[in-house]
């Protein structure tokens, strides 16, 4: 998993509330366990019409938001069924941070487990970011170490984060990476077990 320390990037405002995981990545794109290539399905029913043509006024189709790495979202983002493909699709598109007033619990956990930073701010702070991102300057900065979001106009907003999750994000540690850190202890245990209980090795 890639470490997350600081992100300076373009922010796209998506003011809709209660965006569920089926809207983030529709079910027809869930037939793979590969993380790459899922960007094409991200917000598919918002981005394309019934004939597969881009819907010009959807935020991610607008030229000024192309290449956005931060999504400013409405309340209760990521609700609905559990699907790890949702953060995968966002990250494959290039979005590394989502800012909202709240996230569905399972989606929130899936984000942290995959290296996508979910940031919870107060409603009035999200409203400021939404407003400013709709202007001429769309650039924001997220500093995980300092736990701050800097708006396009320079306003600073503090966010809370579980210290254990923060540490893992800063170090780029997922479950596998965490386990590999204890590789030496695991090897010692397995060698000792092989001597003490050789019948288990048969």
Swiss-Prot record:
GO biological processes: L-leucine biosynthetic process
Reactions catalysed, as given in the entry: (2R,3S)-3-isopropylmalate = (2S)-2-isopropylmalate
CDD domains per the UniProt record, alphabetical: IPMI_Swivel
Keyword Coiled coil: no
Keyword annotations from UniProtKB, A to Z: Amino-acid biosynthesis, Branched-chain amino acid biosynthesis, Leucine biosynthesis, Lyase
InterPro entries: 3-IsopropMal_deHydase_ssu (IPR004431), Aconitase/3IPM_dehydase_swvl (IPR015928), AconitaseA/IPMdHydase_ssu_swvl (IPR000573), IPMI_Swivel (IPR033940), LeuD (IPR050075)
Metabolic or biological pathway, per its Swiss-Prot or TrEMBL entry: Amino-acid biosynthesis; L-leucine biosynthesis; L-leucine from 3-methyl-2-oxobutanoate: step 2/4
GO molecular function: 3-isopropylmalate dehydratase activity
SUPFAM superfamilies in alphabetical order: LeuD/IlvD-like
Pfam family, one: Aconitase_C
Task of the protein: Catalyzes the isomerization between 2-isopropylmalate and 3-isopropylmalate, via the formation of 2-isopropylmaleate.
Assembly and oligomerization: Heterodimer of LeuC and LeuD.
Protein name per the record: 3-isopropylmalate dehydratase small subunit
Biological source species: Caulobacter sp. (strain K31)
